[in-house]
């Protein structure tokens, strides 16, 4: 997303985060439902834009912890949709990024939650994806 890096320095300690324009500080990732990424049609996808190897990206299926999501290189689904609607120049073509994560829920799963923790231990609000409506 459109934004900028913020660095906070206290004495000899430094922390940083990415601040997305129009969003609160704790908006650090976006979740895409199954079927959004055509190469991974059964997976729920998380885009964690300021991710590095010290971050944790975990998922829960119907409240049960399932562990770490699997990182993969991919293209931004939002940008692919945007570019697909327009005739674009070569310089606007999508670029592969390294900050995508996938989890494949069971067929009977009703809800997936994703939790992200940054390198400084900040836990960002869980995001949910409803897979099956309540009966």
Where does each model-flagged region fall?
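Binuclear metal-dependent phosphoesterase catalytic core
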Residues: 1-51, 55-58, 98-106, 111-130
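Short, structured coil/loop segments at alpha-helix boundaries
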Residues: 18, 65, 75-79
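Long, compositionally biased intrinsically disordered regions
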Residues: 24, 70-75
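Conserved aromatic beta-strand anchor motif in extracellular beta-sandwich/beta-rich domains
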Residues: 59-63
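Aromatic sugar-binding surface patches on proteins
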Residues: 76-102
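Extracellular interdomain linker/stem segments of modular secreted and single-pass surface proteins
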Residues: 133-135
């Amino acid at each position: 997303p459109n934004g900028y890096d913020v660095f906070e320095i206290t004495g000899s300690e430094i922390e940083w985060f990415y601040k997305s324009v129009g969003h609160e500080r704790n908006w650090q990732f976006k979740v895409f439902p199954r079927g959004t990424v055509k190469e991974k049609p059964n997976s729920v996808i998380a885009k964690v834009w300021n991710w590095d190897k010290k971050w944790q990206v975990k998922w829960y299926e119907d409240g049960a912890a399932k562990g770490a999501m699997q990182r993969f290189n991919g293209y931004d689904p939002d940008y692919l949709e945007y570019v697909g609607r327009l005739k674009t120049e070569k310089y606007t073509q999508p670029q592969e990024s390294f900050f995508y994560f996938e989890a494949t829920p069971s067929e009977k799963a009703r809800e997936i939650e994703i939790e992200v923790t940054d390198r400084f231990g900040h836990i960002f609000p869980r995001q949910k994806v409803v897979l099956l409506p309540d009966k």
